[in-house]
Structure formats: C-alpha cells, structure tokens
C-alpha cells in the first residue's frame, strides 16, 4: 500500500488519491509486485537494494550515489508476550531520497502517522527524514524503559517463586535486549555518518544542529541498552546460581532425612510389625498400646543418635 503526503504550513498532510503517486513524501507498507515495480521505476531502485530494505536482518547503513540517497535503519516493533516468550522484534525501515522526493519502505503493518505528524516542524523532505530518525530513537528509549521495568518485576517473581516460567521469560527478555543493543549500535553509527556528511547529503546548518541533538540522544540510548544488557546478563546468571544453590540445599536436607531414616527403616524392616507383635506376646507380655509406643520411642532415639553422629562427622 502506497500513501502520499504533501507539505502544508510546516506539516505533512495526506494527499488525495489522485496526487498520491506524485507527492513529495510517499509511504509504502508491505509492497506487492505492482508496487515494487512502481518503486523501482520512479526511484531508480535496483532489485538488490529493494530486497535489502525489506530484509529485517539488514544492517543499518546509508548509500549516496547516482543522485540518490538510501538509508536503512532499525525500528522496534510492539512488545508482546506469546506462550511465556517476550516478543519484541526489530524491523528494517528504508528511506530513499531521489529527485526531491522521499520514499519510506517497510515490510510490516505499523502506524506511521506518529512519525510524520509529530510536533516538529517540517519544511522539506530532509526534515521529514530527521524527524523519523528522532522518533525512532525515542521509540527505542521508551521500549528500553518498559523492558527495564519488566526485568525488575521478573526478578522479584523469580526470587519469590523460583518458577521456570519466569526464568524463561527473563531469558527471552535478555535475548530481546541483545537484539535491541545491536540495532541501536547500528542506528547510532548510521546517524553519526549522516552527521559527518551533512553538507554532502544536502542538509543545511539548522538540520545539522538537529542531527547533533539526535546523535547525542542515540548515543545515550545506545549506552543505556548496553548497560541494561550487561546488568540483565549478570543478574540472570546470579538468579540461576541462586536457584541452583536453593535446589542443592533442598537436596541436602532430603539426603539428611533419608540418612536419618535409614537405621530406623533397617530395624523396622528386619523385625517387621508382625514379628514384633509375636515377639511381644511371647516374651514381654505387654499390651500393644504400650509396646508400640516404646518401639516408636526407640526408633526415635536411634534417629536422634544418627543425627548427632552426622553432626560430629561434620556432614551437617
């Protein structure tokens, strides 16, 4: 689907259907074969470049040749939880400047109006590109904040319940943070390259100052992602060690109980309840209400002595 936008009083306004294909700003989402042919013809795009833009694994980069500027950056998708797996993908967003026209291409269904209709004033297509880079950086920052809060909540749940579900979600969150850090590093390098070549790419001084602010925000966001990723990795390792230590302590207690019960089970197994009843009737002549409590007391004393022996042997 292709949607056109025109400039009006420092803002972008959606163009009519008749003017969509000739608008200075075009947005193409999930292009079909006909739209791909239109893009290749009107913006002189090769099939390889178009496939690179639509590839979600493509690294952020910029190309400037043949009077055409191609920018590929990363943009975060919506965060969701599917079967205890945190889904936070990163998509590729392509921008092409050719003959005073700007084309955005992406292979996902997302609302792009928040990028174009932001409070920032836009006078030409390069202002629009700067605005999109700025909004992408802010979007990453908001996602990092949400993921940090989710990490803290999952840590508390792991401590309280020690459930494998929460731990798997923590692993999934750590994987997403790794993808985010990689995407932010690529975007930061892209913005740095645009800033260092503003005159060559046709940006004016005011736009360069705006790019400088975006560059600082991107570097800060990139550093925040790296710090959060490092903390999450170390905290995840610590949680795993803590859970392993808890399991080891539990197994130690169960082993101690089994060892203490072993002599008692041995005595009860050799004698047996039926044999003890016959032995009591023939030799002790005591009522069962007296003989069995004495037997249980004896077994308890044996267990207590076993416990004390283990203590002296430094096994407890």
Per-range role (PLM):
Residues 1-196, 203, 213, 217-220, ...:
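Peripheral, non-transmembrane regulatory/ligand-interaction domains of membrane transport proteins
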Residues 194-206, 232-243:
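Long amphipathic alpha-helical coiled-coil segments
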Residues 44, 216-316:
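Hydrophobic alpha-helical transmembrane segments and their immediately adjacent juxtamembrane loops
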Residues 80-85, 201-205, 277-285:
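Short helix-coil transition/hinge motifs at the ends and kinks of transmembrane helices
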